[in-house]
Swiss-Prot record:
Gene3D superfamilies found in the cross-reference section: Ribosomal protein L25, beta domain, Ribosomal Protein L25, Chain P
Protein name: Large ribosomal subunit protein bL25
Cell inner membrane listed as a keyword: no
Taxon lineage: Bacteria, Pseudomonadati, Pseudomonadota, Betaproteobacteria, Burkholderiales
NCBIfam families from the UniProt entry: bL25_bact_ctc (TIGR00731), PRK05618.1-5 (NF004130), PRK05943.1 (NF004612)
Amino acid sequence: MQFVAFERAKQGTGASRRLRISGKAPGIVYGGSAEPQLIEIDHNALWHALKKEAFHSSILDMELNGQVTKVLLRDVQYHPFKQQVLHVDFQRVDEKTRVHLKVPLHFEGVEGSQAVKVEGCTVTPLIHELDVMCMPAQLPEFIKVDLSGLTSKSTMGLQSVKLPHGVKAVVRGSNKNPALVSIKLPEVVADATAAAAPAAAPAKKGKK
């Protein structure tokens, strides 16, 4: 995806406020060997771009002063109640340096799985994006998770996902295989399963 940015000469609260009134959004691009650069972007164009998933999770082409620079979206500040972007941060991308980014997970095939189609389970995603690290050229816009083989007894953890070549998941904490979805049986089936469980043997009375 490509967007157009312009150099911003002034900074500060007052200058940023005047910029927003004129229909522009203030921002900054940093990283790499160049100095941080203040920029401004047409607010409407930026607002519509931010609605697209790929704008958040892929390498972008930023056109500035007739030159195109590869960047990543790093931070967006929104107004608390207006539909307005207050500030946006981009980071320059070095093609020889690994990038660390959150990539969306696309869950596919769940409606045709045995868990849903036959057993009537409710399948709920627990994780919607994944921290990954890879070279810029290998960064995927999203990662597909195939749920077509799910049953009510399935477990779907991170290690069940086939990551694209060169992409490594970054997992924090001791659990290296976090669950990606929860699988819940219909209440009627769950109640029947519980009722069919053998009752606990009564405790023996002590001798008098």
